[in-house]
Amino acid sequence: MNYELRQACDYCTTDWSGGRTTQLYIYPEDGDYATRNFAVRISSATVETEESVFTPLPGVQRELMILEGTMTICHEGGSPKSMKPFCDVDSFSGDRETKSRGKVRDFNLMTQNGACGTLVFVET
């Protein structure tokens, strides 16, 4: 098995409408989030506004876990869900309009094009 040790300066951080996002991993390696050309993307983002609207991502399955802060998230046609750090994972389709309330730092898994995955918090 091959592995690669990366440092903070190796990651790309960009702005989105509610804060900043740092891409930690993308597959395939030459994938591109901006053009939605990827099968798997892992990122960590900050939500820096009290209320935000998530970026629409048609065809992308999303898994979200809060790392810091608390958030209430609501998807189009659904009920609001309160989320606390390392307690809750929210799985949702990027096709649905998603709004949130609360300033947080989160961890995201995005999959599409036949890829799948799940976020699970393992307490040691």
Residue ranges of model-derived segments:
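A short hydrophobic beta-strand segment most commonly corresponding to one strand
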Residues: 102-118
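Solvent-exposed residues in well-ordered beta-strands and their adjoining turns
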Residues: 27, 48, 110-114
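Short, positively charged
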Residues: 36-50
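Short, conserved beta-strand element in jelly-roll/cupin
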Residues: 59-72, 108-112
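A short, N-terminal "cap"/entry segment at the start of jelly-roll beta-barrel domains
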Residues: 1-36, 53-56, 73-107
